[in-house]
Amino acid sequence: MQYKINMYAIVVYDVNVSRQNQIREFLRKYLYHVQRSVFEGEISPSSLYYMKKILQSYIGETDSLIIYVLRDKSCLMDKIVLGEDKDLQIY
C-alpha cells in the first residue's frame, strides 16, 4: 500500500516586477494564490523539491522568496486575516 505524504507550504515573495508574472504563473501550478505575492497549499515532497529548483532559477540578486514548510495544514495554529478575506476554501 502506498501512502501519500503531503506537506503544507506558504510561499511569499518580493521580486522585480519583470519576474512577477513568471513566478506567479509557475506557483499557480502547485499552490493556491491567496494574496498578491503569497501562495499556500498542500504539496508533496517531490513537488516541493522541483518547485524550489525552478524558483531558484527565476530569482535575481535583489529578489526575495521565502518558503515556510509545515508538516501538514493541521500544524498551522491559526490564520488571522485583517481586511478582505480571500480564503479559497483550503482549510
From Swiss-Prot:
Its cofactor is Mg(2+). One of its GO terms (molecular function) is metal ion binding. Mg(2+) binds at D14. Pfam families: CRISPR_Cas2. It comes from the Archaea. It is an enzyme of class 3 (hydrolase). One of its GO terms (biological process) is maintenance of CRISPR repeat elements. Transmembrane segments: none annotated. The keyword NAD does not apply. The keyword Metal-binding applies. Its EC number is 3.1.-.-. Keywords: Antiviral defense, Endonuclease, Hydrolase, Magnesium, Metal-binding, Nuclease. CRISPR (clustered regularly interspaced short palindromic repeat), is an adaptive immune system that provides protection against mobile genetic elements (viruses, transposable elements and conjugative plasmids). CRISPR clusters contain sequences complementary to antecedent mobile elements and target invading nucleic acids. CRISPR clusters are transcribed and processed into CRISPR RNA (crRNA). Functions as a ssRNA-specific endoribonuclease. Involved in the integration of spacer DNA into the CRISPR cassette. Belongs to the CRISPR-associated endoribonuclease Cas2 protein family. Homodimer, forms a heterotetramer with a Cas1 homodimer. This is CRISPR-associated endoribonuclease Cas2.
